[in-house]
């Protein structure tokens, strides 16, 4: 077998399709009981980010695969179960299921002296086996290692309520009649706070730092359609920033009017949060903004403004660590937390190892994943070639320097990409 693909979510299936189209033999290892990745609803005993109210934040016509669109019956922003069903349908249509080994967890990936890769996996019965491959494509994402404040605020160990991470949150109905504090202002935080506000007795949203909250549509266009529009990509970075800032003022006013902290950075200097719902829930009094948590005191949560609220649960929506425990330390995440990949795909100096889907665009990721997958397949069969290692490292250094200049040293910033310019790299080097 030539290639091992790790993960059978949106990215892994795109890789499988590209390899199959080029006649490259492969196996795809997936630790879950079905394909679909983060869009699957985790079963009993499973952990996963697929809470029941999870929907796409990007429009279906740009999130579906190019030659296998999502069903016309789907809404513009399908729910997670619809996306999971769509991904399984794609796997069936593309003939990928025979290549996927389910309930198979990758334990270790190491390169041998002869350049091949030894992959150790564990099946559902706990039996480990080792196989050799010429190439390995990691498409498992980075939503498995929950990031919590370390240390938690003082008093957390004696808090009488429940403290959990969004990875373990499933349904607002589980908190019916309870008082809940949600921590964060990212995608999962605003989704979960809105969900809880329909079930919990009281829902508080604790926000340490302001982020730009962006409606899913501006002037009747989804934000991912805007990100791929020719007129958008013809504008300079400064022009795009001014356009969005003015559009946000028109669409929702200032965040301080909702009791949220104003961002301390301009648009495109940090991650944005897409939501049509959270600001409305705040306006209706269903979600109450609060500052950061300072400490816990028995059944009370004390905030940095000195106020305190009784709470039965605290849900930390504080993201994930970028970890790949089956890979050697420092690959692809350096000691400073930056992801060091040529074109956000190839770790320089590790021939035969690739990463697909380890990017964070403003807009839909699918076009990027398909471009990465096609490029990787061409690299594997020799239709494309990599530059020298020195040149790849120089590209990585230049890219990361630009990221620091634009975003600062924010966690996760090193996987941010602009859709248009990023896709252009592949179009120029791989003309169809």
Which residues does each PLM region occupy?
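Long alpha-helical segments found as membrane-embedded helices
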Residues: 396-404
């Amino acid at each position: 077998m030539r290639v091992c693909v790790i993960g059978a979510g949106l990215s892994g299936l795109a890789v499988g399709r590209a390899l199959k189209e080029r006649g490259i033999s492969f196996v795809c290892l997936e630790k879950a009981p079905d394909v679909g990745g983060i869009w699957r609803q985790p079963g009993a005993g499973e952990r996963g980010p697929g809470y029941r109210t999870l929907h796409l934040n990007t429009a279906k016509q740009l999130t579906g695969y190019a030659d296998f669109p999502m069903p016309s019956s789907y809404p513009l922003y399908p729910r997670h179960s619809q996306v999971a069903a769509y991904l399984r349908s794609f796997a069936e249509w593309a003939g990928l299921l025979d290549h996927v080994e389910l309930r198979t967890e990758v334990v270790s990936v190491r390169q041998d002296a002869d350049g091949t890769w030894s992959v150790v996996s564990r099946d559902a019965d706990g039996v480990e086996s080792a196989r050799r491959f010429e190439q390995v494509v990691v498409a498992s994402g980075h939503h498995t290692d929950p990031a919590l404040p370390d240390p938690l605020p003082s008093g957390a160990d004696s808090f009488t309520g429940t403290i959990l991470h969004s990875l373990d949150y499933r349904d607002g109905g589980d908190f019916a009649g309870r008082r809940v504090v949600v921590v964060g202002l990212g995608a999962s935080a605003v989704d979960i706070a809105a969900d809880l506000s329909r079930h919990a007795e009281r829902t508080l949203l604790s926000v340490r730092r302001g982020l730009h909250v962006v409606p899913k549509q501006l002037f009747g266009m989804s934000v991912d359609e805007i990100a791929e529009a020719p007129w958008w990509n013809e504008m300079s970075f400064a022009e795009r920033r001014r356009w969005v800032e003015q559009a946000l003022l028109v669409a929702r006013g200032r965040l301080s009017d909702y009791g949220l902290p104003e961002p301390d950075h301009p648009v495109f200097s940090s991650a944005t949060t897409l939501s049509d719902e959270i600001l409305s829930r705040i306006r209706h009094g269903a979600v109450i903004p609060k500052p950061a948590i300072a400490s816990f005191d028995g059944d009370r949560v004390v905030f940095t403004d000195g106020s305190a609220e009784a709470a039965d649960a605290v849900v930390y929506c504080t993201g994930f660590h970028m970890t790949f425990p089956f890979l050697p330390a420092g690959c692809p995440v350096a000691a400073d937390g930056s992801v060091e990949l040529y074109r956000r795909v190839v770790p320089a100096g590790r021939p035969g190892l690739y990463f697909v889907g380890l990017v964070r665009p403003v807009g839909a990721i699918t076009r990027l994943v398909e471009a990465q997958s096609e490029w990787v397949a061409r690299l594997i069969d020799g239709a494309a070639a990599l530059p020298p290692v020195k040149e790849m490292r120089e590209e990585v250094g230049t890219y990361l320097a630009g990221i620091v200049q634009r975003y600062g040293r924010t966690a996760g910033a090193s996987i941010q990409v602009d859709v248009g310019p990023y896709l252009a790299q592949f179009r120029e080097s791989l003309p169809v």
